[in-house]
Amino acid sequence: NWHLWTGDPSGGYASVQTSLGCPFRCSFCCINAPFGEAGIRLWSPDNAAAQIEALVRDHNITNIKIPDEMFCLNPKQVRAICHRLIDRGLGSRLNLWAYARIDTVGDEEMLALMRQAGFRWLGLGIESGSRHVRAGSSKGAFDDGDVSAAVRRVQAHGICVGANYIFGLPDDTLKAMEATIALACELNTEWANFYCAMAYP
């Protein structure tokens, strides 16, 4: 119920997929298990915008989640979707929510366009306050400064951040988990989710 954040519980809720899969190989993630390999397939921007427009026009649904693992991976794709939503006059009506990696939100122009197109929330996979733990799970080489800068960059464009953290990754220690809590407190994002790592067969 992310739309309740703004105090407007009247709208419905829907989900629209604009891509499938992920090109990364984070060791804790099973998104690519069904496909046997890392990769991503994109729906066309016209298709994505048309689905969102139909939800607004035909069902008065303006609270829409885009559950793609890597929505911000391809700035060209993101811009194309945003332009189509703006051209349809939907930006001011929408409350969109999407997911991204820390190292895919460096494009200021893209973030500004996303806000204009109706994106109000971005879920960021931070996972751990320890660079060693992140690297050990193939999460990326970014450090805590990169994490903080990415969060502030997104927020500066009027987009709320939902931060995601995981406890119990293979290299996690008590000290690393304390660092994760400290980072979460320091960032103080609008929302935070804390998960426990789970082994899967």
Language-model features: locations:
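Radical SAM [4Fe-4S] cluster-binding motif and immediate context
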Residues: 1-162, 182
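Flexible glycine/acidic-rich beta-alpha junction loops that bind and position SAM and/or redox cofactors
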Residues: 24, 75-76, 132-137, 167-175, ...
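Catalytic cores of alpha/beta
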Residues: 109-112, 171-186
